Amino acid sequence: LGVLHRRLYASPAYLKHNGIPQSVEDLSHHDLITHSQHEHLNVWPTQSGTSFRANGPFCSDNAATMTSMAIAGLGIARMPSLVADPLVAQGKLQSVLIDQIEDTPNTVSAFMLSGRHRLPKIRACIDHWAQWLQTTTPTC
């Protein structure tokens, strides 16, 4: 259907209070918002080919909750740019370390069973997601 990009984001208020990290090493001095269900999403690949293991006081298994925590100024989160970039445009979030944390694209796929059980509503949903993912391009 398309590609999902993940980047680091934090609220302007959080960054004003805690400072903007200048390097991957600086992240160890920041509050990080991590995934509680998918541990592989807490390993943040770097541009230099290494990775940073994110640990933090806040975690969730839900992108909407992680987004709300980041907007509320609780820390830095690695989130889908599809969700966060519109919030950057609104001034609610800022990108962090875009030149140091790898923007690893993740392919988004959908599968349907063949045959008579294909519902038009399912097809319409998949078509909508495909259009949404393909019209959303990285801004960084």
Tell where the protein language model's regions lie, with residue ranges.
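A general structural signal marking secondary-structure boundaries and capping sites
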Residues: 114, 133-136
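Short amphipathic alpha-helical coupling segments at ligand-binding clamshell hinges
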Residues: 80, 117-131
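C-terminal regulatory
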Residues: 1-108, 135-140
